[in-house]
Amino acid sequence: DIRGRKAHLLREDFCGTASAACEWVRQDENNQAIGVDIDASVLDWGRQNRIGRLPVADQARVQLIESDVRDVDTPPVDILVAFNFSYWIFDTRTKMLDYFRKAHAALKDVGLFFCDLFGGSEAFEETKEKTKHDGFTYVWHQAEFHPVTHYMRTHIHFKFPDGSKLKKAFTYEWRLWTAPEIRELLEEAGFKNPTVYWEGEDEDGEGNGEFSPEDKGEADLAWISYVVAEK
């Protein structure tokens, strides 16, 4: 809708198990996806458990590359995505600007860059949040936060009905970036119109899964948003 044309070639940076890449090729037989990640073991798992479950014709339209996202050389893409906050591993302006410039160069002339970010007053706390699901409880643990540098270390734990636990199933160390910082860095890297998409609310005041452009946002305790930037 932003560009008034269909996109067919997507690159998923920090792709991990390539979930977004696989979903992209499912949506249209003309779609192709490239996934880039530096971790070979995670890519292997994705090949077996994500790509391997696609129809054979769809499998051929997903390519996984083991590489640092700043070094990889791919054909120009319509869309480049960096989700799950993984790009926050770049913990200085110099590193983040370098990545954004590389992302800008990797896009076609009318390409779009998508990333996500989270914030709110609770993002600056050392805390745990539990969410119950069928068969397990998901625990998001903000174990360490440094106000001076915005360094943070987080874990994901799982608890099960039989009393067993899987502690530190995932651990992340990154910088907590803010929305204005990301928008300014994107513009400095050459992107145009970096726009934050904010989630709407249902009648109970909870997120409704619908995101729309917003230039102010709400002072919520915790929020997740998307940023879209144009080349």
Describe the role of every protein-language-model region.
Residues 96-109:
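A short glycine-rich, Lys/Arg-flanked "PGG" loop and its adjoining helix->strand segment in the class I
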Residues 114-185:
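SAM-dependent methyltransferase
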Residues 54-69:
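Conserved SAM-binding strand-loop segment of SAM-dependent methyltransferases
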Residues 176-231:
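C-terminal lobe and adjacent flexible extensions of AdoMet/dcAdoMet transferase-like proteins
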Residues 6-16:
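Conserved class I S-adenosyl-L-methionine
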Residues 17-30:
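Conserved SAM-binding loop of SAM-dependent methyltransferases across substrates and taxa
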Residues 70-80:
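A short acidic, Gly/Pro-enriched loop at the edge of an enzyme's catalytic core
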Residues 46-47:
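Conserved SAM-binding loop
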